[in-house]
Each structure stands twice: as structure tokens, then as C-alpha cells.
Amino acid sequence: MTPILFIDRDGTLIEEPSDFQIDAYEKLRFVPQVIPALLKLRDAGYQFVIVTNQDGLGSDSYPRASFDGPNELMLQIFESQGITFRDVLIDCSWPQDNAPTRKPGIGLMTAYLQDRSIDWARSGMVGDRITDLQFADNLNIRGFQLRTAQFGGQWDWPGIAHALADAPRTAVVQRDTKETKIRVELDLDRAADAHISTGLPFFDHMLEQIGKHGGFALDIQAEGDLHIDEHHTIEDTGLALGQALREALGDKRGIGRYGFTLPMDETLASAALDFSGRPYFVFEGEFKRERVGDMPTELVPHFFRSLCDASGLNLNLQVRGDNDHHKVEACFKALARALRPALARQGTALPSTKGAL
């Protein structure tokens, strides 16, 4: 899905003159830092749509010919710098007309509201007036009021680009079934002590390894039917954690994608993974004991398979050694250490020739 940044024109892309009409070439001046900000957002996957009110455009007081020349030059300059606009939507009514197509109305948005390829959760609106923020509210998207001497506001273009392109990768997943109630919170861009409670102390310790050695904040709270057995709790925790990883990663733009071999005394574990969007799990290893602590060893590969299914992860996990405790822990640590480079931001490009992950 593609996020859209809807952008006001006068006062947002180009400076607004005292008479509020850019009807001559000499009035054309760009707002500071707009071009580098739009380039950053373009590289983060955004498309741009201009939405502008032009009072009485086409009337004797504001002839269309006076508007078209400067507007075309503006678009040409943006295009010369690598910035193109998906659409330019213009309302030509007067304020007193109360036209539904005039911002903050969303009458010009009909086609976009029907477009299921738009990522509305990441989309936004940038403008210099309160009506632009109201327009954003009407679309249920995030609004940014650009700071200007005329209308106030608190944002500049670098700040807007940072807020959208470098947005924190967080997720909260609540998974409730008849057998379990599980809540997972994570922040891929913040290191913090993991907080884990599943009712299975050894499983808690293993999950802590994922947050600690993966380098991200992780909180898992699980209640399950442990009076029956551990299966549902371990399986559903894997599914909830996988779903949270998928949600936090978004379109995966900028991630390392791939990623570890980890020794632990006599044990060696190897985790090779790919956030390909095609879940697949291969496990090579054997456990001699039926349980390690309160965790059945047969559920160790089952947890990882559940994680892969929910996150869209391709994981090949191998482990060999003599001590089953070491082998189980090495599996979790190897996954975590493989996650660290795979989740790390390494720019803005999508690591795929297909254009999607």
C-alpha cells in the first residue's frame, strides 16, 4: 500500500504573497527546505497530491492564464529535482459558496477514498491554515500546520519529513481466544529491558533473549490455559509476536532484511532469516529431554513456526550440542541476533527488486 501526502500549495510549497494570489512569475518563491524534505519523503515511498483553494480562479479578478504560467513553472522546477505530483486538485470557488470541494471539504477526494491501494494510516496533509488541519481531520489522517508568520503553526519541512519518514516502528497486538489472552508491545527503534510474563518462567527467559539480543523494547503479557498444557500459550505467543513484528515493520523500507551463528559453550546455533513476506520455517536439531524447565522441547520449533507464519518470516534454524538447555537458549539467542541486523534501518530503499515485501 502507498502512503499519500496531500499538500496545500500557497504558503506551503511556495511563499504566499500579501495579496494571496500568485499570478505573476516574479511572485514565485519556494518555501525553505521543501525540496529536500519532499525528496526524503519520496524515498520513503510517499506520493504527493496538491490540494489547493484558489478563490475565484477563472474570474476577471483572477484569470486562468495568470495562474497557469507560474503554476506550470513551479511543477517543472519540482520535476527537475526529482519530485512529481500524482495529482493537482484545484477548487476555484469563493469562500461564501461553501462548496463541498473547497477545503476543509473533501469533495475532491472521491476517487482517493475509493482507492484501496492507499495506506491511509501513514498518509498525511501539510498546509499553512487551520482549514488544512480540518481537511486532514475529515480524511482521518495526520495533519501538519506549517509554521508561517501569517497563520502560526509549529512545523517546518525538515520536521515533517522526519516525523513521517523516520516514524517510530512500534506495534501493540492484543490476541484473545478461548484459550489465551496475550498482549505484545514492541518498539524496534528503542532498546530497553524486556518485560515478559507468560506463566512459564523458562519460556519467559527465552523470550527475554529476543528483546535483549535483538536490541528492541519488548513487552509480552500472556494468560493461558496452563492447567491443561503449555501448547496454546506458547503457540499463541509466537503468533502474537509475529503479528507485532509484521505491523511494526510496515512496508519494510530501509531494513537490512537478512540476517547469525551463535555459540553457547558446547552448543552451536545458526539462524538465517529473511523478511520476505513468504513464511517458511526449517528446523534442524534434536532434543533428548522432554522438557527444559517448564517448557516442552517439542514446542520449541512450534513456537518458531508460529512466529514465522504470523510475521511473514523465512527462517532456517539449526542447532547442535549436548546440553538441551543450552540448545534451546542458543536457538532464541541466534534468532535475536539475526533479527538485529535484519531490522536495522539502513537507508530508505526497499530491499527487493519486486518493489514489495
UniProtKB/Swiss-Prot annotation:
Alphabetical UniProt keywords: Amino-acid biosynthesis, Cytoplasm, Histidine biosynthesis, Hydrolase, Lyase, Magnesium, Metal-binding, Multifunctional enzyme
Listed SUPFAM superfamilies: HAD-like, Ribosomal protein S5 domain 2-like
Any one annotated GO CC term: cytoplasm
GO biological process, one term: L-histidine biosynthetic process
Names of the cofactor(s): Mg(2+)
Subcellular location, principal: cytoplasm
Domain of life: Bacteria
Places the protein is found: Cytoplasm
Positions with a binding annotation for Mg(2+): 8, 10, 128
Region described as Histidinol-phosphatase: 1-168
GO MF assignments: histidinol-phosphatase activity; imidazoleglycerol-phosphate dehydratase activity; metal ion binding
Pathway(s) the chain acts in: Amino-acid biosynthesis; L-histidine biosynthesis; L-histidine from 5-phospho-alpha-D-ribose 1-diphosphate: step 6/9; Amino-acid biosynthesis; L-histidine biosynthesis; L-histidine from 5-phospho-alpha-D-ribose 1-diphosphate: step 8/9
Catalytic residues as annotated in Swiss-Prot or TrEMBL: 8 (nucleophile), 10 (proton donor)
E.C. numbers: 3.1.3.15, 4.2.1.19
Region (Imidazoleglycerol-phosphate dehydratase): 169-357
Family annotation (NCBIfam families): HAD-SF-IIIA (TIGR01662), hisB_Nterm (TIGR01261), Histidinol-ppas (TIGR01656), PRK00951.2-1 (NF002111), PRK00951.2-4 (NF002114), PRK05446.1 (NF003937)
Family stated for the protein in its record: In the N-terminal section; belongs to the histidinol-phosphatase family. In the C-terminal section; belongs to the imidazoleglycerol-phosphate dehydratase family.
PANTHER family on file: IMIDAZOLEGLYCEROL-PHOSPHATE DEHYDRATASE, IMIDAZOLEGLYCEROL-PHOSPHATE DEHYDRATASE HIS7
Official protein name in the record: Histidine biosynthesis bifunctional protein HisB
